[in-house]
């Protein structure tokens, strides 16, 4: 059967068409802009901690002021004057055969040379620490790159800096997994999932051990001054070990700068995460009623040590965090609580018997 035809519909007038359509202004691109064009992506809002760390990085970036330039120029002029005067004294002592003065000039030259060498060494180590931030930015760019040829050389440089031998099983698995058709993003991602976890696992063990030692020391020791000295020493040692694991050799000023960065990072971004990670679990388990005051203080000190280690790990790590592989305080919290409770139970058992 065929369906009946629908009747015709007559309209009173023509359809209304917008006589003034709104168009955006024409925008032309030159050849250079066309080659560097990248489509905009709608990403999720960055995390609060990332925003805070960006503000912190901007605040920590040194500003080249006029006074600083004047001080540096004065120091350079003073150094040149000292060197020139030393050369003149040496020439006069040689001409007059004043061997005592000549020996003093030689001793002064050795002292100045040692001082200059120390300054150069400290500057090189501090520069190496700053370069790690640039390497992290480069790795972040490679993780969003579709080019080829740079990822493998970059990862091999990171492995060499970390002291990973070519015969290491993780590095061998990475070599076996990459091939010529992969772009830089895939090569760096494979390195981040196959090789980088080896160093991260060692850093996690160092953080866990230092946090546990800090927790037990505070929970057992009755002397607050000893506790403070012990925590400071353990935290500095933890930072040194983490930096060494990631191939960074710290000098005096670079160690102070890293410690300053870690403390500022904790001050800017640590409070909210500490409350978020610890607060709910602390209240739900009613730890204040189960543990003594010293034990609670020990857990707090251990968590702060763990937080310091995590931020030192983040600043020394050559790659950004990928796929939520960043360690959290919750990873160390349960271990610290278990160790404190076990220690308290061992201490009570002999007295009860």
From Swiss-Prot:
Keywords: Cell inner membrane, Cell membrane, Membrane, Transmembrane, Transmembrane helix. The chain crosses the membrane at residues 70-90, 100-120, 213-233. It is found in: Cell inner membrane. InterPro entries: DUF697, UPF0283. Its main location: membrane. The keyword RNA-binding does not apply. It is a multi-pass membrane protein. Coiled coil: none annotated. Belongs to the UPF0283 family. This is UPF0283 membrane protein YcjF.
């Amino acid at each position: 059967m065929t369906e009946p035809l629908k009747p015709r519909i007559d309209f009173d007038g023509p359809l209304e068409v917008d006589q003034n359509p709104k168009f955006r202004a024409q925008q032309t691109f030159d050849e250079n802009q066309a080659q560097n064009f990248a489509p905009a992506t709608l990403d999720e809002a960055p995390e609060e901690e990332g925003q805070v760390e960006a503000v912190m990085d901007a605040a920590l970036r040194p500003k080249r002021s006029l006074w600083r330039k004047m001080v540096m120029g004065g120091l350079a002029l003073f150094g040149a004057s000292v060197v020139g005067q030393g050369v003149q004294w040496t020439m006069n002592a040689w001409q007059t055969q004043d061997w005592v003065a000549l020996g003093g000039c030689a001793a002064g030259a050795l002292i100045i040379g040692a001082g200059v060498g120390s300054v150069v060494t400290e500057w090189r180590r501090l520069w190496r620490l700053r370069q790690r931030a640039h390497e992290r930015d480069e790795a972040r760019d490679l993780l969003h790159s579709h080019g080829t040829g740079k990822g493998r050389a970059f990862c091999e440089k990171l492995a060499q800096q970390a002291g990973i031998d070519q015969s290491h099983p993780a590095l061998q698995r990475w070599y076996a997994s990459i091939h010529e058709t992969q772009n830089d993003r895939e090569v760096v991602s494979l390195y981040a999932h196959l090789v980088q976890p080896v160093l991260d696992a060692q850093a996690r063990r160092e953080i866990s051990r230092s946090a546990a030692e800090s927790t037990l020391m505070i929970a057992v020791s009755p002397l607050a001054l000893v506790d403070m000295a012990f925590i400071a020493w353990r935290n500095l040692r933890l930072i040194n070990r983490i930096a060494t694991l990631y191939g960074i050799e710290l000098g005096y000023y670079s160690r102070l700068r890293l410690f300053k960065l870690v403390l500022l990072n904790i001050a800017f971004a640590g409070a909210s995460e500490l409350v978020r990670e610890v607060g709910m679990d602390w209240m739900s388990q009613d730890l204040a009623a189960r543990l003594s005051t010293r034990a609670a203080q020990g857990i707090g000190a251990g968590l702060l040590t763990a937080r310091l280690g995590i931020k030192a790990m983040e600043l020394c790590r050559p790659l950004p965090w990928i796929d939520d592989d960043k360690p959290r305080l919750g990873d160390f919290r349960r271990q610290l609580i278990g160790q404190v409770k076990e220690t308290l139970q061992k201490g009570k058992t002999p007295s009860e018997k």
